[in-house]
Amino acid sequence: MQLRHQLRDQINSGLVGIVSEGTDETVDMALALTAQADHDRLRLLPIAGAGASQSAEDVMLTRGIDFGIVQIDVLDEIKRNPPFPGVENYLQYITHLYDRQVQILAGPDIQSIDELRGKNVNFGLRDSGTYTTATTIFKALGVEPDVTNLPHPLALDKLRRGEISALVYVATKPSRLFQDIRPDENLHFLPITGSLPTNYTPITITSNDYPEQVSNDAPVKTVQVGTVLVAYNWPTNSERYQRVNHFVQAFFEHIKDIQASHPKWHQFDITSLVSGWTRFSPAEQWLKKAGLTPEESKTTVVDLDTKQREGLFKDFAQREALFREFAAYQKEHRPTIVAYDNH
């Protein structure tokens, strides 16, 4: 019995839960970190969240969740409309992570965001990161559509059938959601221009991202929003504090290995600040000990040569292809569900 308890404690001492709207990014982080930090007995448990705001609340209130991946604009919204007073004292950040791109896919009869006034546009589920971003951007541009709140795959089906005019999806590109769109469907991305809050920075969608929807000579202007790794501000003498601290040390020590493991992470900056929020103390101490400051952020960027970068993207493309093949197989071989009458 004692041996079983010791084994249980040993396993759980290195297990941390991390919540995000989608598990893809947390699985990637878990694989990268675990591969580099086996000697730290560190494992990540990816948890699919119920929405961006909910993910932040889960970090503060839900048992077994130590970290969350949350968009910067969602953090701003949480501060404007906190779930309880003093939220900034409980929720702290570890580091900036990667950016998510705002992708507006429209039907053939829509050529600009202005044309979406009064039209049916899907913003995703309420309290999701996409909903928060879409609401902010459309308000800033002075465009008021008829908003629907459907899951993204269902919204894409409705867009294909012409039942809605466009959908907004905030995710790293290229997104799996758009992988199977055919050229003859005439769906295309809308450019985002105009004055927007500083959380949103310019980026382009190119034919490298979506060969079937974007031509080589006509990249689409859009914007992106950063994501942040957040944690609960545990008391320093608590077991959970030690567990979070353990993760932070391993994460920062293996940062270059983690960055090099995935295309979307190879240039995120661990030193940049998140305005209005406090960095988790062990993370702040690690950066100071390493002599890193926001002004020196470029020293934390992985320097990949052309050959390495090509290899990285090739490996990522192979993983994506395998995932699509597996998804297609599951769909084809899905068992038939028979409904039984219990009466």
Residue ranges: model-predicted function:
Residues 1-7, 154, 171-185, 189, ...:
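An extracytoplasmic/periplasmic, membrane-proximal ligand-sensing/linker region
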Residues 11-15, 39-41, 51-54, 62-64, ...:
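Extracytoplasmic
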Residues 13-37, 42-44, 99-157, 161:
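Bilobed "Venus flytrap"/periplasmic-binding protein-like clamshell domains
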Residues 16-23, 44-46, 56, 90-91, ...:
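Second-shell loop/turn segments in exported
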Residues 29-36, 45-86, 156-158, 174-181:
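Pocket-flanking alpha-helical
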Residues 72, 82, 144-239:
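Pocket-lining segment of extracytoplasmic ligand-binding domains
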Residues 72-109:
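Signal peptide-directed extracytoplasmic domains
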Residues 126-137, 203-276:
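Ligand-binding clefts/hinges and TM-proximal coupling segments of bilobed small-molecule sensing domains
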